[in-house]
Amino acid sequence: IDEIGILAISTRLQRLSEQLRKDGALIYKSFDIDFEPKWFPVIYRLHIKEMLSVVEIANEIGYSHPSTISLLKELEKQKIISSKKDKADERKRLIVLTAKGKELVVKMQPVWTIMKKTLNELTDNQNNLLKAIEETEQKLER
């Protein structure tokens, strides 16, 4: 795959993503935190914004509506989030972190600091990976 170059970019990014998720899961496990890395974008957004609708979460994390629903069901089953109907629009579900979800965030914050430092070191090189990804995403949006 590596010799194919640009034609394999999707495969290489997927491989990198899978490795980062796997390593992230091992880090959480080493801190005795029962957490799936795929839950991170939802948990983090709710930690910052406190209450969001399903559509707002999907838009903010960049997932499709069905993928977001599936992820939310998983988190609800784990009792990390709960949902309630919006009083102004009963078709809309509002999502919040439960007490268990908030405790989880408190437990994870020191780990996020470590992960952020490590990821910054990993991507801060001659061709900054994060900047390159952001530039590519912007080009794709045009």
Predicted regions span which residues?
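N-terminal leader segment of winged-helix/HTH proteins
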Residues: 1-33
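N-terminal helix-turn-helix DNA-binding core of bacterial DNA-binding proteins
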Residues: 22-64
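Charged, amphipathic alpha-helical coiled-coil/dimerization segments
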Residues: 73-131
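Residues within helix-turn-helix
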Residues: 54-55, 66, 73, 93
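Generic non-transmembrane alpha-helical segments
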Residues: 23-31, 110-122, 135, 139
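N-terminal positioning helix adjacent to the helix-turn-helix/winged-helix DNA-binding module
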Residues: 5, 9, 38-39, 100, ...
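C-terminal regulatory/oligomerization modules of transcriptional regulators
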Residues: 1-2, 125-142
